[in-house]
Curated annotation (Swiss-Prot):
Matches recorded under CDD domains: secoisolariciresinol-DH_like_SDR_c (cd05326)
Gene: ZSD1
Gene3D superfamilies reported in the protein's UniProt record: NAD(P)-binding Rossmann-like Domain (3.40.50.720)
Organism of derivation: Zingiber zerumbet (Shampoo ginger)
GO biological process, any: abscisic acid biosynthetic process
Protein name, as recorded: Zerumbone synthase
Coiled coil: none
Keyword Oxidoreductase: yes
Stated role: Catalyzes 8-hydroxy-alpha-humulene into zerumbone in presence of NAD. Also converts borneol to camphor in vitro. Zerumbone is a highly promising multi-anticancer agent.
NCBIfam families: PRK07231.1
Tissue spec. comment: Expressed in leaves, stems and rhizomes.
Amino acid sequence: MRLEGKVALVTGGASGIGESIARLFIEHGAKICIVDVQDELGQQVSQRLGGDPHACYFHCDVTVEDDVRRAVDFTAEKYGTIDIMVNNAGITGDKVIDIRDADFNEFKKVFDINVNGVFLGMKHAARIMIPKMKGSIVSLASVSSVIAGAGPHGYTGAKHAVVGLTKSVAAELGRHGIRVNCVSPYAVPTRLSMPYLPESEMQEDALRGFLTFVRSNANLKGVDLMPNDVAEAVLYLATEESKYVSGLNLVIDGGFSIANHTLQVFE
């Protein structure tokens, strides 16, 4: 029970990686507040995880500061504190790659959720954590935070920004005993990512098609990256096992971002 007695707030916790994080945290003894805009899914996940007093759901649009403030205050009042803040909510945005065709409003929407939402989560978690002189803030970035060409421009720019925010806030909050890190996974099969499979690679079995495409481009063969694997990395950064780790972008990509896939020296 690596999180016995801890309290965590997980944004975007109603589905995908966020749901896996919430489930794993519960398994390790934490109390969880799932924050999302998907009310029905969020309530269902909360109940599947045992409901009150182990898990609860709170409606929150992470782009609205009052929503984030209320979600943080609700969690702290219900459970007495917040030990772990997981900024997981995010979107990929339109599949448009050609910058000449990119919609500026869509670009701003991606930044609003993926960057501003993370900033607000950090800001309001800090309100609770600073007086206690401890806490862990973990945000979800992406392999697109360290390379280009793996996603649309807005998504890539936003995930780079998450890494910058993580380092900047870690530099400030270290004096208060608060650790701030982020996790950058390679392609993971979720409801958010699977529609971005190239049409030429789609199969009748959507999951099989996605995994086939991802495996063909992966550096590390013979293993698939799944939502629970990302949750395990977040768990590590949330626990005392990483007590001296802060400002880290933990890249979980099987070496994809460090390999030059065009030269094929090792073929």
